[in-house]
Amino acid sequence: MPATPLHYPVAWGLSKLNKKLNLPGLIIGSFIPDVEVPILFLFFNVGIDNHFILHSLVGALTIGTIISILVTVYIYPILTSLIFRFDKSNLKEVCRLTPILVFSCMLGNIFHLLLDLIMHPYSLILWPFVDPHKIVGILVLVFAVGGDLQLGFLIANVLTNLVMGLFMVAIIIKNRRNLWEQILIGQKKNDLKF
């Protein structure tokens, strides 16, 4: 799996493809499925590379979307305004509950799963309907020298993290003016009109 922050370029790209989408919702939605990883590790002694319900379509479209909405509406404006000194009232407006925000949170969750899907030796995307070990990521298969899925996963993981990291650097360079507003809200602070 790409490191959680490296799911950001997909959220940013979606917001550029459709300007009506809500960037904070896409960001939070693209990060939320990985919330289960430390929880599984800390409370259930499950390996750090394991996933569960939030990495399935069933979980992402229900629990993941609900958590994403709650975090985007109630936590994101507070944290980003505290850390980056954004105008809290503008952030609350950008992060208010709307059908577009809900859809953006849902899309963020789905695209997290799709990015993970291509580079894992198993996928819970169709859980509980299909055995996760019957779904092998295309990059894992491409790089599985001699059928070694672990080697395929290692190469796919490194390659995916590298590519997403390069996209992240490109996004930062492209948005260096008003960087934080551009990459966290999607608009320059003075472009927000309410």
Region roles according to the model:
Residues 1-194:
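N-terminal membrane-targeting hydrophobic helices
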